[in-house]
């Protein structure tokens, strides 16, 4: 028999804020975190905008010496993980250490550090390569550092599945608890690819918005004039806990992780296919023993791409049938941009807060809704509403899909 899993801690680093209170306030009030890129000169690239993390100081979490040994994506993951752990109010002890684990992943990992090290190598030779280059770039090192920092001796690894990474990490962590391999898991995703290669690579694919003159309206899911996604960065991390374990210690419970579904399109490396996401959604509902009518809110993948937004709309209609018209569907990417491997992490945070606070954040920048995208997208204003169960979707290159459900407790 599966054990129940609840969410007892949340942490976030994002373009809309580097703590839970700030980020949620900005999301609910429809404030965009997208602006012109400041980290490097993007003028040679067609896209000049991104959702950068601002005013972030890693030295408030770890020493400057430690920080220099890590790429920025690890900084973000550590910070969000430490926030979530503090939020849950649990201490690691000799008695419980082996029952607490970490699964925090990244879609791409240490790209800026790889770029910088390549420049050093070409200009000054191999002797200038830092001995921390490899461990500072590895994707599983967020989990490793969190495990070491707190003495967590349970399962520790990372999932890598492009833009579904964060959700897959959370779903896998929940299953470890459900089937008895752990009692508590720290899980989510982190990413930092606002760099020449990161922006340049996606621009070469013509995947990014080029609305450079108006950054805050560039990410516009389901709008008729959407022209691509906006790259974002940051991290979102949850603490998942076995229900009786959390209840016994009097923990605050944000919601119950109640369903997890996965699927593959088996179609194309980048082009979407509506049947794959449909099956992922249906699998999540089946896993949670949920009926279609149990779901009121969907935090959609909603990237603001011409093909992707219509495809997700079609998948939702296929999965939910007539009930799709009753769903409130929201894309927080309209404010944060697309955080790639961290997207499922921060969107799990936002989905959990939507259920906990009984409010759907808005999808901003819907000026002219695409007639082919004909669901209720909570356009431009947040909405107080009853949410018994919220669903979050993530889809990634290679046709990998994930959906998770959070129930009000």
Language model segments and positions:
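Glycine-/small-residue-rich "gating" segment that lines the acyl/pantetheine channel
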Residues: 123-130, 171, 175, 179, ...
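Conserved catalytic cysteine-centered active-site region
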Residues: 1-2, 36-79, 85, 109-172, ...
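Conserved small-residue
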Residues: 9, 27, 81, 102, ...
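Short glycine/threonine-rich loop-to-helix capping motif typified by GTGT followed
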Residues: 266-277, 303-320, 339-346
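Phosphate/pyrophosphate-binding loops at sites that engage ATP/ADP/AMP, CoA/4′-phosphopantetheine
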Residues: 84-96, 246-250, 281-297, 319-323
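Condensing-enzyme catalytic core mediating Claisen C-C bond formation in acyl metabolism
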Residues: 4-8, 35, 213-288, 297
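ACP-dependent fatty acid/polyketide chain-elongation machinery
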Residues: 1-66, 88, 244-256, 349-363, ...
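Feature captures the FAD/FMN-dependent oxidoreductase FAD-binding
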Residues: 74-96, 101-106
